[in-house]
Amino acid sequence: MDFDEELNLCITKGKNVDHSFGGEASSTSPRSMKKMKSPSRPKPYFQSSSSPYSLEAFPFSLDPTLQNQQQQLGSYVPVLEQRQDPTMQGQKQMISFSPQQQQQQQQYMAQYWSDTLNLSPRGRMMMMMSQEAVQPYIATKLYRGVRQRQWGKWVAEIRKPRSRARLWLGTFDTAEEAAMAYDRQAFKLRGHSATLNFPEHFVNKESELHDSNSSDQKEPETPQPSEVNLESKELPVIDVGREEGMAEAWYNAITSGWGPESPLWDDLDSSHQFSSESSSSSPLSCPMRPFF
């Protein structure tokens, strides 16, 4: 049954109804037919039953041809998936072939998301930095009394033995310099009982200082004992000779007598004259003052 026939039936039914209410509907029916049949007016969205798209407007319509088309489309989908599977598997194998390709894929994804999110250049750099491999942290040697600041400098400090107060030693570029500063101060405060970072430096220095001090003490030379012995031996020889001469003179005087011509008086005069000359020639002796 065509659309035109259905439309004619509706018109005829309308005429019958319009006759019951009045004759106005019969007068207007030809105009309505012309309007509906005019080619300028677009057809309604529902068309004849021959087109498969017209059935979608009616939920109660079930066309076997439409069902067949849907089944055919459903059968085509797994075929396409099967055709695409080898290529996807090949791509996956290529991606997982080496870590360099994985890194390239990550960079590509980062670039893609940065472009889609309209990130700033700084944001892109941060994303690239976060994706880079983290370098392993090289732990430096820890020294006693030394710690590192956040900006990379090294500081040294020590506690006093009695008050336990912190003594600031300064800021250094390297950890070794800070450790040496700590060792110097610890050796001054505690001596040999101090625990040092580099004990070999201070032990060797102390032994060298001790050797140098001992050599300095040995430098002043004492007089040679041979010279002292010679001088001490010469003096008693002179005294002994004089005593022997005096003894011989006294012995001769006693034997020859106590006269004025005896040699005893000559010896006494000569000894008296010798003593007066020595007293006058010595600078330490004071001249005798006259009594009058």
From Swiss-Prot:
Residue range(s) of DNA binding per entry: 142-199
Keywords: Activator, DNA-binding, Ethylene signaling pathway, Nucleus, Transcription, Transcription regulation
Alphabetized SUPFAM superfamilies for the sequence: DNA-binding domain (SSF54171)
GO BP: ethylene-activated signaling pathway; response to heat
Residue ranges of the region described as Disordered: 14-51, 207-238, 265-292
Residue ranges with Low complexity bias: 271-285
Entry coiled-coil feature ranges: none
GO CC annotations, alphabetized: nucleus
Composition bias type Basic and acidic residues, residue spans: 207-221
S-S bonds: none
Major location (coarse): nucleus
Record-stated family: Belongs to the AP2/ERF transcription factor family. ERF subfamily.
Name under which the protein is recorded: Ethylene-responsive transcription factor ERF054
Name of encoding gene: ERF054
